Design a protein with these regions (language model features):
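Short hydrophobic/aromatic beta-strand element in the GNAT-like acyltransferase core
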Residues: 20, 94, 107
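Regulatory sensory and allosteric helical modules in signal-transduction proteins
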Residues: 26, 42-75
Length: 136
């Protein structure tokens, strides 16, 4: 884990009142974990390297759009993998962060304690703030 990303993530989660989250950087053909906050060790281990299209982060990367769930533990869409259900949270979103050229450089994930659908304006605000993610 990279302390720059860990510090940024803690502050980012606090600004959006989220209880857990992660930063995954694009590393060739997979996403590599760079920071995690309040994720169980088994979730960190399972998400060290995420292939394109797998789980919420992999889908956000593949489709270049935020992927959300109202409830991590009860999601049946297939986007939430079994390991992620161990996260102590309900509503969650994974969203792409792009570099200046528009290429996805990272996926940021956030989870909240309450069950809800995130409105478009809240996702837009989170997306705007995620652009402050430090460069690798």
């Amino acid at each position: 884990m990279d302390e720059r990303f860990t510090t940024w993530l803690r502050d980012f989660l606090s600004r959006h009142r989220a209880v857990a989250g992660s930063v995954h950087l694009v590393d060739g053909d997979h996403l590599a974990i760079a920071a995690a906050h309040n994720l169980p060790p088994q979730v960190i281990e399972l998400t060290r390297a995420i292939p394109l299209g797998k789980g919420m982060a992999g889908l956000a990367w593949q489709h270049d759009k935020p992927i959300q769930t109202c409830n991590l533990k009860e999601d049946t869409s297939g986007a939430v993998k079994p390991g992620a259900k161990a996260v102590d949270g309900k509503a969650a979103v994974a969203l792409p962060v792009k570099d200046a050229s528009g290429t996805i450089r990272a996926i940021v994930g956030l989870a909240w304690m309450d069950e809800r659908e995130l409105p478009a304006d809240e996702i837009a605000a989170i997306d705007q703030d995620a652009r402050s993610l430090p460069e690798a």
